[in-house]
Amino acid sequence: MTILFMGTPDFAVPSLEALIAAGHTICGVFTQPDKPKGRGHKLQPPPVKELALRHNIPVFQPVNLRGEDTQREIQAWGADVIVVVAYGKLLPKAVLDAPRLGCVNVHGSLLPKYRGAAPIQWTVLNGDKTAGVTTMFMAEGMDTGDMLLKAETPVGEEETSGQLFDRLKDLGAQLLIETLEKLEQGALTPIPQEEAQATHAPMLSKELSLVDWTKPCLLYTSPSPRDISGSR
């Protein structure tokens, strides 16, 4: 299967690694532009870019996907599927319609719960005892597409949010490979999301983004500063 991959942070790395290991043809990788970090404010590449370059995969870092030239370039790849994992940008309709089999997203929650940019962090904030990942076809709304597969996992009593993050990114990679296999076989039945059950997981405020990855997740039962962070 020929795949165009879109992803940026650590959460997306295992998914790209799994696609490479499974023998899929990765025709290109789209990721966010390099950003200044550290005391010297030197430009640092996203983790997905570093992985792609190690495997000699072409990398593209447009500011957005709205430009006609960028959209024509994406269409010209002729990918069977566009896989999106924590890319950080919405895909316009011209991009969503480009691949033969659609755009498949790996999301770090059991949709329709926790749509948005920080599903794992809000899982921890709310003291949930169960977490998971969902694969879905992408639509124009924020995480509103039809669901394909889910994988659920309990949150361990002594598990830190850092450990949960790492488990879910690996679980997402496994679920992605299973999803693509079944998609290629025509063995998937997309399931629309129940809008009445949808909840949202927006980016965290500064007050809620204090980093402490050493505390057990289940210590937390209500929204307050706790063991959470944005994408690492």
Which ranges hold each PLM region?
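N-terminal glycine-/serine-/threonine-rich beta1-alpha1-beta2 phosphate-ribose binding loop
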Residues: 36-80
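Donor/substrate-binding cores of folate-linked one-carbon enzymes
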Residues: 22, 81-200
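N-terminal Rossmann-like dinucleotide-binding module
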Residues: 1-40
